């Protein structure tokens, strides 16, 4: 048996740097069904105590089919940490520098969400670069419920200038 080396204990064996990414590269994130438990956990973590997010009868009395997801509950599904991007960039990621979103359709308890990120921007600097993603979340009916953008600052390999 080989000796244990913690530097080789990685989800993704090869690290990627700014120049390793390409426009159009797509990162599919795990799907998730918005169960009552997910709603309750998010409501508790967010501190949003509006009954539209946790009281089924309140929602039904207002003509809604069930609990309405908080917008950030849909947005959080696009967190790159749910996929492989942060594991690919453990050595090169400097920081998360920008995020924006538009909430296009309501998300209700029982909906299954399918998030994805696609690289749509690569802006090279001297020793770093910005990787921009378009983010989308679709529901089980194929409707886009969220679209947005995320930007990350990554190091270039060995700080080499382009």
List where the protein language model places each region.
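HotDog/MaoC-like acyl-thioester-processing domains
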Residues: 1-22, 103-162
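Catalytic strand-loop segment that frames the active site of acyl-thioester-processing enzymes
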Residues: 2-69, 156
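A generic structural signal for short beta-strands and their flanking turns/coil linkers
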Residues: 23-25, 30, 38, 48, ...
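Short, intrinsically disordered, mixed-charge
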Residues: 44-48, 80-87, 140
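Hydrophobic beta-strand-centered segment that forms part of the acyl-chain substrate-binding groove
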Residues: 62-69, 73-120, 145
